[in-house]
Amino acid sequence: MNMEEIVALSVKHNVSDLHLCSAWPARWRIRGRMEAAPFDTPDVEELLREWLDDDQRAILLENGQLDFAVSLAENQRLRGSAFAQRHGISLALRLLPSHCPQLEQLGAPTVLPELLKSENGLILVTGATGSGKSTTLAAMVGYLNQHADAHILTLEDPVEYLYASQRCLIQQREIGLHCMTFASGLRAALREDPDVILLGELRDSETIRLALTAAETGHLVLATLHTRGAAQAVERLVDSFPAQEKDPVRNQLAGSLRAVLSQKLEVDKQEGRVALFELLINTPAVGNLIREGKTHQLPHVIQTGQQVGMITFQQSYQHRVGEGRL
């Protein structure tokens, strides 16, 4: 089977990830579980020669690893991670939906579109690896593209979803290809007149600092973070800084944060996967807790904040049960 046929078969079986190893049979992940794939492993190095340019191949050779994305036939796009291991080169491939999903299709909290109308501030999407953060960010961009007149600038590693400008002008930059780092790209973005900045990941204190500055100075910043809950996201941001900087960062975050959307995926009754959400909205009470370093109280605030649109994972689970999905 060629790669296009393998991907078509994977889509048919609701595969989320493909694992192609030079020395072992191919495997794929379905509903979160690894299984043997019913095809022979293609020549990984031949695939990389076809997919990567000279600069990317040089990076892979020098660093022993490379993140990239590639488009195949019929609008199918893959996010790839190539890495060297003791038997040769391996590929981990994430299948991306061929079309940008809508927030309603994801079952995202109904207050989210209202939050996206903010003219400035920081909205975080958090969760474990493979929890669908990139898909949710793509749905947010898709919503803005249909409902707002704005300039959206994305910084991604790699570029995953491809957007066609509709009401919005959308410009996508890839780390390592169009700019060297998230921090350098974000620093440049402040001079490129964006209304909305999408950051694929808040990786370090410099990027976090620049993101908070952008959020304070008239930009809506959408970004992801690898944490399993909203309160942990706030703690993670603050803990990225040395002790003497934590209080100023708390003050900055208390003023600029708009919301934290955390998510995870569960296997549903239809043998698919369904997203559960936790949403923290930065009300005056939440801002005070962040400013005072009392993030341990945020879970209780979320639990009692339904009247303003907040939701816990447990409440999201019960909603999915009511829908018949779980």
From Swiss-Prot:
CDD domains: PilT
Family to which the UniProt record says this protein belongs: Belongs to the GSP E family.
GO cellular component: cytosol
Keyword Ribonucleoprotein on entry: no
Natural source organism: Escherichia coli (strain K12)
Protein known as: Uncharacterized protein YggR
SUPFAM superfamilies xrefs: P-loop containing nucleoside triphosphate hydrolases
Binding locations of ATP: G127, A128, T129, G130, S131, G132, K133, S134
GO molecular function: ATP binding; ATP hydrolysis activity
PROSITE patterns: T2SP_E
InterPro entries: AAA+_ATPase, P-loop_NTPase, PilT/PilU, T2SS/T4SS_dom, T4SS_GSP_E_ATPase
Keyword field: ATP-binding, Nucleotide-binding, Transport
